[in-house]
């Protein structure tokens, strides 16, 4: 093992030797003697700590040698001190513990060392053992009594051993968890925590049986300066987030329709924010991290629990950032922009790793495919492009042909289908289509009445239902499998800007130019077949 070094965290130097000592103490307290010995030998670092120095030294003072030798076996003391300690077994001879003395004299390492290096001293012990008798007054040097000899040993031991509180490793970990709770990094109601991964164990959240949303549940009012430009439910089902015109990112409790009180930074009016309007929001798969893109060309990455900005890309593009997606392992972010390009950014390096150029207008949406070896994008130029994620080469462009009836008009969004990832749900202005990426053919279409333009659309979590809003602010609900229209009604008085479905509940959030955010729920008495 290499020599331990020190590590500096926020100007506090942490010695690696101290970390090893914490582990040594843990091994000792949990009776893992073999591991304790192996780690001490490999690192050359010794614990030399006792639970209670006072108790240990009192055992020496009172001649409780069974307790003393048990503790000493876990320490790394100097050879001189060990020989002095083991020599004190003459007291056991005085108590006629002959067999024990014989074992200690002939089988222990300190006395074997004495035999090889201080023969006269060793033979003195051996001779007394053979006679099975000892006069301690004759054995000690002139004027030394048993009590004085024990006092000398106590002084020697006092210089080589230390005492530390028990369970230091667990205590420090506990303090760390309490601090993270105080900072909002760990939820207050958290009862389990994976120390190794540094996260709350993932628990699968049971999804409600999917039903269409028809009933207005909550309404949140904004004004023209702070109205949301984008909204999204978190994948861990906890929050609804809004990104607003004034640059604020707010985390809402969708059950109450109010700002979440579980996040300390929001309670202190310390919000996540940009200097300009927020255009897009994306979550990491586990919901721990948030990426936001703004009109002033910037991307910021946040930890939702603490509200801290972890990474900035300034600028990320030469124009506003319109769409974002995390890679599956949350180490990269894919972005699209008004500047017609896409980029992959590295969260560790803080740099753009790849750039994709080829669209002739705004990039409106982008995503990785399932294997993350392809990037898929759509644009206001009416084209869908499929890119090689490593080389940045455009591998395929889906454009109108005599076979493909997708019109050469703005494509607002794309969604990969769960059951068949070779197909895309494509939201065009005039219709919503299911398009094969291989054949570039349309297998199904969804249209509004009187060919009204679609503004936004989203799928239910299991992709049983398609929700789409047209320019008259009518919400259309389609059976995604059959294509039949199940319901339609007006949801806003002005243009709908953004839409998001809850990942496990029958909740749909919408926001519009009327400065309202509305949350819709299902009515369990609805007969969706009517």
Curated annotation (Swiss-Prot):
Keyword NAD assigned: no
Instruction: Report keywords, A-Z.
Output: Cytoplasm, mRNA processing, mRNA splicing, Nucleus, Repeat, Spliceosome, WD repeat
The cross-references to SMART domains, in alphabetical order and at most eight, read:
LisH, WD40
Ranges of the WD repeats in the UniProt entry: 223-262, 273-314, 316-357, 358-397, 449-490, 491-530
Spell out the GO cellular component terms annotated for this protein, sorted alphabetically and separated by semicolons.
Answer: cytoplasm; nuclear speck; precatalytic spliceosome
Main location class: cytoplasm
Annotated CTLH domain ranges read 49-100
Subunit structure as annotated in this protein's UniProt entry: Component of the spliceosome B complex.
Q: What does this protein do?
A: Involved in pre-mRNA splicing as a component of the spliceosome.
Question: What is this protein's name?
Answer: WD40 repeat-containing protein smu1
Q: Which organism is it from?
A: Dictyostelium discoideum
């Amino acid at each position: 093992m290499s020599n331990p070094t020190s590590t500096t965290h926020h100007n506090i130097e942490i010695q690696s030797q101290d970390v090893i000592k914490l582990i040594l103490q843990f091994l000792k307290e949990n009776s893992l003697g073999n591991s304790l010995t192996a780690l001490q030998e490999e690192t050359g670092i010794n614990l030399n700590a006792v639970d209670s120095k006072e108790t240990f030294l009192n055992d020496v003072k009172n001649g409780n040698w069974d307790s003393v030798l048990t503790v000493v076996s876990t320490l790394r003391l100097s050879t001189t001190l060990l020989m002095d300690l083991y020599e004190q077994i003459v007291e056991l001879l005085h108590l006629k513990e002959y067999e024990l003395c014989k074992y200690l004299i002939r089988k222990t390492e300190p006395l074997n060392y004495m035999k090889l290096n201080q023969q006269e001293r060793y033979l003195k012990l051996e001779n007394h053992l053979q006679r099975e008798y000892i006069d301690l007054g004759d054995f000690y040097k002139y004027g030394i009594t048993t009590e004085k000899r024990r006092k000398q040993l106590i002084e020697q031991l006092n210089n080589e051993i230390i005492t530390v509180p028990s369970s230091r490793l667990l205590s420090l970990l506990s303090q760390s968890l309490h601090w993270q709770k105080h900072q909002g990094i760990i939820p207050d109601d958290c009862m389990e925590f994976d120390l190794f991964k540094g996260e709350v164990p993932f628990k699968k959240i049971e999804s409600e049986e999917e039903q269409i949303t028809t009933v207005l549940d909550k309404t949140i009012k904004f004004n023209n300066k702070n109205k949301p430009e984008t909204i999204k439910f978190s994948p861990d089902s906890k929050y609804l987030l809004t990104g607003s015109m004034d640059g604020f990112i707010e985390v809402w409790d969708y059950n109450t329709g109010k700002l979440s009180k579980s996040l300390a930074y929001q309670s202190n009016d310390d919000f996540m924010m940009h200097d300009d309007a927020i255009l897009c929001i994306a979550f990491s798969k586990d919901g721990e991290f948030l990426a936001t893109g703004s009109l002033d060309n910037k991307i910021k990455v946040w930890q939702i629990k603490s509200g801290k900005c972890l990474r900035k890309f300034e600028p990320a593009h030469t124009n506003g950032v319109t769409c974002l997606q995390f890679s599956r392992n949350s180490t990269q972010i894919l972005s699209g922009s008004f500047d017609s390009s896409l980029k992959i950014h590295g969260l560790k390096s803080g740099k753009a790793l790849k750039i994709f150029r080829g669209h002739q207008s705004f990039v409106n949406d982008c995503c990785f495919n399932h294997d993350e070896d392809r990037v898929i994008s759509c644009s206001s130029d009416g084209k869908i492009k499929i890119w090689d994620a490593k080389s940045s080469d455009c591998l395929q462009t889906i454009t109108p042909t005599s076979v493909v009836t997708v019109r050469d008009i703005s494509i607002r969004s794309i969604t990969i289908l769960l059951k068949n990832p070779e197909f895309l749900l494509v939201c065009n202005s005039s219709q919503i289509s299911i398009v094969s990426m291989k054949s570039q053919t349309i297998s199904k279409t969804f249209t509004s009445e009187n060919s009204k333009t679609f503004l936004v659309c989203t799928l239910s979590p299991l992709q049983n239902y398609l929700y789409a809003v047209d320019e008259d602010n009518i919400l259309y609900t389609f059976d995604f499998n059959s294509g039949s229209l199940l319901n339609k009604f007006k949801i806003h008085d002005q243009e709908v800007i953004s839409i998001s479905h809850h990942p496990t509940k029958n909740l749909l959030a919408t926001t519009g130019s009327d400065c309202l955010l509305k949350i819709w729920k299902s009515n369990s008495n609805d007969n969706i077949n009517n």
